[in-house]
Swiss-Prot record:
Keyword Cell inner membrane: no
Organism, scientific name: Archaeoglobus fulgidus (strain ATCC 49558 / DSM 4304 / JCM 9628 / NBRC 100126 / VC-16)
GO cellular component: high-affinity iron permease complex
UniProt-recorded Gene Ontology molecular function terms: ferrous iron transmembrane transporter activity
Lineage per the UniProt record: Archaea, Methanobacteriati, Methanobacteriota, Archaeoglobi, Archaeoglobales
Subcellular location: Cell membrane
Chain segments annotated as coiled-coil in the UniProt record: none
Sequence intervals crossing the membrane: 46-66, 73-93, 143-163, 174-194, 228-248
Name of the protein described by the UniProt record: Uncharacterized protein AF_0154
Tagged with keyword Cell cycle: no
Amino acid sequence: MLKMMGQMVITLREGFEAALLVAVLVAYLKRSGRTEEVRFAYYGTIAAIAAGFAIATAVIVAYGGLHGEQKELFEGFASYLAVGVLTYMILWMAGKDVRGEVERRAEAKFKWGIALIAFVFVVREVIETVLFLTPFAIAEFTTTVIGASAGAAVAITLAVLILRFEYRMSLRRFFYATSVLLAFIAAGLLGYGTHEFVEVLEEEGFEHPLFEKAYSLGIDESNPLHHKGLIGGILAVMFGYSASMEWVRLILQLGYLAAMLGLIHRSYGRVTERAEV
């Protein structure tokens, strides 16, 4: 259960954002007396989820056709891409007015326009989720699927409850806390992707002082504290822990984490004193 926490946090955050956007859209339509258009919001949502499954399947099939060094390069690029999109998403969401954005877009009277709005809202989050989860799915497919499913279920439940109780939960606090968690996860992905690239370069005979080990805890893979073990695996997913690291990985990982935590804190300010989303 604990080893899937990273995947669960990702889908909880992304799924919650998507579910909240759709829930606000549906509530706005009902409040505006446009109940006959609610089904179009659901049509758009279903189409977006289907598109997400198609993209995920294509990624898995593409990875399955790779071998050796190609897989390492794919994992490295997938990790870097996930970090890039994740970074953009965290900072972009910091300044969003969820309710206001949805209601402005929903003012259009075209029914299929409502479906398109819902599709755009959801497919963006679905694609981001697929990108974020790809490195995890490559390493542990079953754990990733279970963790992602659990996160999505919790996200949908939270979105419905929050809408029903009229935003009594502080959404800014929620997004602030999950942004901090995601910053640690993204830093770990950056480190993992860097490690894969280092391995490829070393196999090609390329050497550099930064590729040398910055530290090694001397932990055997059979030890639960190893990053492939039970306890170490949890820490690896959630916080980017590894039993050993190259200098370049350590520098990039810690540098990214420090920069992101600073930007997140600056973007949200003193969360307890800020207005809710």
